[in-house]
Amino acid sequence: MTKGLSWGWTAIKYLAVFLVIYTAINWWRQPVMPANPDLQLTDYQGQTVDIAAMSHDSPVLVYFWGSWCAVCKITSPTVQSLAQSSPYPVVTIAIQSGDNQELRQYLKAKSFNFTTINDEEGDIFKAWQGQVTPSFVILKDGEMTQGLTGVQPEWSLRLRLWLSSVF
């Protein structure tokens, strides 16, 4: 009995250390909102997307990804599901994923129909000091409330958007 209890405490300690390290790495790698960000952008179809205005109605999830990113192949379907079924707007920024025609073909092949800004040269991502893809930012009232990186389950993104709408 003592052996089982000891194992349980060891597992809890390792979990706590893992969570602290995971949180620290995520905090360090998260994008940083520029001082004067350009939040009125044009999507790959030529439509104006005013993220700041959208964020005054409800929190907006901004998803930085690339067609070349292996992890994004896991997270993009989650973002697609969220964009289709969530009351919160989703805007994606495709980083260095080709010209508008190549991006259009990629999105069509994957059946993604979320709003997408084509960051052909990666300038938007650089302005946000992005370090890794995928990266997520939640904006509310034109301000960044949360930044995340890596694989994020849909329930976590939904919860974070809801919390941003409440607080």
Language-model features: locations:
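Short, small/polar residue-rich loop motifs at catalytic or cofactor-binding pockets
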Residues: 35, 58, 131-132
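N-terminal targeting signals for export/organelle localization
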Residues: 1-42, 167
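Short active-site neighborhood of thiol/selenol oxidoreductases, capturing the structured segment around
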Residues: 50-73
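Structural microenvironment flanking redox-active thiols in thiol-disulfide oxidoreductases
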Residues: 73-110, 120-126
